[in-house]
């Protein structure tokens, strides 16, 4: 494996190489490559989002984050169907992520929920056909981020331009990297494979219904940062209940641990470098292969932004409440939904 090929490995792959190292020299080499990968990734991400902020305004820096997520994921991941059809679907997904979150913010919580359900149905049914590729962690997360950081007026016009550029970049990279791959299925096959009795379809329906429901309830309760609850729910919903229960436990414990660590850093560090706590969290996520640790470090970035608006106490309270509510609601909802579907299946 070349230096460049090793740089392409994810955290789990890199750590697997470290564990299999037989000599100190070999292990030191893999550690060096791993650290270089983290440094290069962080530098590239920071530069990419900064450029988007300069071009389209600081209020649209989140567009840079969403586009970056799509580029990094879909340069390797696919949608499981013909490359041409997949490319057109990606363009459609960008249209949905650009328009629907903005429109949903203009509606009442209930009407917004219905629009979000319709939008997520397209993203998940056609973009997340394989749950174990975790495309929902890109598409649904991107949708929720744009929903939570909505803008209006001139800023939204700039957002339209930024997302159009992001769509063009993502589709170009995706098509270039996948055009020589052979796929035997097409868009119609995805429709025909919709089966209410399958674990995949039940998982998709849970994502489609539960995430917007969580957003709606949080907004009806006048809870700021409703997207946090939605992201927590999305992250916890998996096809198998045992995996969901594991995620819920790790999400709750990870967020509480992250809040405690962030609070300690907040009081120890000078106020001039508070914003860099989020960058520290990004590095931590890059070094983490397990979901629990990722939940800890993801908290840093979220709180670094939220403390500017709500203060430390308000941001910490919101983070814990929204995450616990999101994952617990998702667990209860999916447990009932899976049980109901199993009862229906027996009747059929």
Question: Where do the language-model regions lie?
Answer:
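Alpha-helical transmembrane segments and their membrane-interface boundaries
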Residues: 1-137, 141-297, 305-348
């Amino acid at each position: 494996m070349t230096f460049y090929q090793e740089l392409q490995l994810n955290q789990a792959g890199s750590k697997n190489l470290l564990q299999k190292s037989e000599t100190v020299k070999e292990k030191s080499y893999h550690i060096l490559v791993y650290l270089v990968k983290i440094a290069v990734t962080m530098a590239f991400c920071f530069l990419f989002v900064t450029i988007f902020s300069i071009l389209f305004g600081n209020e649209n820096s989140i567009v840079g984050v969403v586009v970056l997520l799509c580029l990094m994921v879909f340069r390797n991941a696919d949608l499981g169907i013909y490359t041409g059809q997949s490319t057109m679907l990606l363009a459609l997904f960008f249209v949905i992520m650009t328009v629907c979150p903005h429109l949903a913010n203009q509606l009442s919580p209930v009407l917004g929920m219905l629009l979000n359900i319709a939008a997520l149905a397209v993203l998940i049914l056609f973009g997340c056909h394989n749950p174990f590729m975790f495309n929902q962690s890109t598409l649904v997360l991107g949708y929720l981020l744009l929903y939570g950081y909505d803008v209006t007026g001139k800023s939204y016009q700039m957002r339209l331009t930024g997302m159009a550029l992001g769509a063009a970049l993502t589709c170009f990279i995706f098509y270039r990297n996948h055009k020589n791959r052979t796929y035997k299925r097409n868009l119609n096959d995805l429709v025909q494979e919709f089966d209410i009795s399958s674990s995949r379809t039940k998982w998709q329906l849970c994502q489609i219904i539960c995430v917007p429901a969580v957003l709606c309830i949080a907004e009806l309760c006048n809870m700021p940062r409703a997207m946090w609850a939605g992201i927590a729910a999305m992250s916890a919903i998996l096809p198998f209940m045992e995996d969901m229960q594991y995620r819920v436990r790790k999400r709750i414990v990870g967020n509480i641990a992250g809040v405690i660590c962030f609070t300690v850093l907040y009081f120890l560090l000078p106020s001039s470098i508070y914003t860099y706590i989020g960058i520290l969290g990004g590095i931590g996520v890059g070094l983490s292969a397990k979901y629990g640790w990722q939940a800890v470090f993801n908290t840093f970035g979220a709180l670094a932004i939220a403390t500017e608006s709500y203060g430390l106490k308000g941001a910490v309270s919101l983070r814990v409440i929204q995450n616990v509510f999101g994952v617990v609601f998702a667990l209860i909802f999916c447990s009932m939904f899976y049980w109901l579907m199993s009862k229906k299946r027996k009747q059929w």
